[in-house]
């Protein structure tokens, strides 16, 4: 009788152990598939995404092509990455965004002005 109970308990523990291993592998592999399904898709490499957003943007003044911001004048357009770029207004009423490049505030604009004058 003790031998039968021992065999029965051994078999039961074996079944529980195998079941736990299969659940582990099922969770591990199915969990990765579900995780991949939840990731957003990359935007397409053509310009259609930009063109669609540009066409849907409503602006009664000037729509900035780089940021799709609506401003009164083209030189009011913000830089797309203000943390890394500094806006510099040119004499002809246009504006450009230039990399700060680790310079202190105003330094990038000063370098553009020096280059415009042919000094650097």
From Swiss-Prot:
Q: Which UniProt keywords apply?
A: Signal
User: Mind telling me which InterPro entries this protein's record contains?
Assistant: LCL2
Checking CDD domains in the record gives:
LCL2-like (cd23996)
The signal sequence is: 1-20
Task: Give TM segment ranges.
Answer: none
Top-level taxon in the UniProt lineage: Eukaryota
Which BP terms in the Gene Ontology apply to this protein? ERAD pathway
Sum up the protein's function in the record's words: Probable component of the endoplasmic reticulum-associated degradation (ERAD) pathway.
Say which family it is in: Belongs to the LCL2 family.
> In its UniProt entry, what is this protein called?
Long chronological lifespan protein 2
Query: Which species?
Result: Botryotinia fuckeliana (strain B05.10) (Noble rot fungus)
């Amino acid at each position: 009788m003790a031998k039968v109970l021992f065999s029965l308990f051994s078999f039961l523990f074996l079944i529980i152990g195998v079941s736990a291993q299969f659940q582990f592998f099922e969770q591990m592999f199915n969990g990765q598939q579900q995780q991949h399904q939840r990731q957003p898709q990359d935007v397409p490499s053509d310009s259609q995404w930009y063109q669609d957003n540009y066409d849907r943007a409503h602006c009664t003044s000037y729509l900035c092509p780089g940021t799709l911001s609506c401003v009164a004048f083209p030189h009011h357009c913000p830089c797309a990455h203000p943390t890394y770029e500094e806006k510099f207004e040119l004499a002809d009423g246009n504006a450009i965004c230039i990399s700060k490049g680790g310079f202190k505030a105003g330094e990038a604009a000063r370098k553009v002005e020096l280059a415009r004058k042919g000094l650097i």
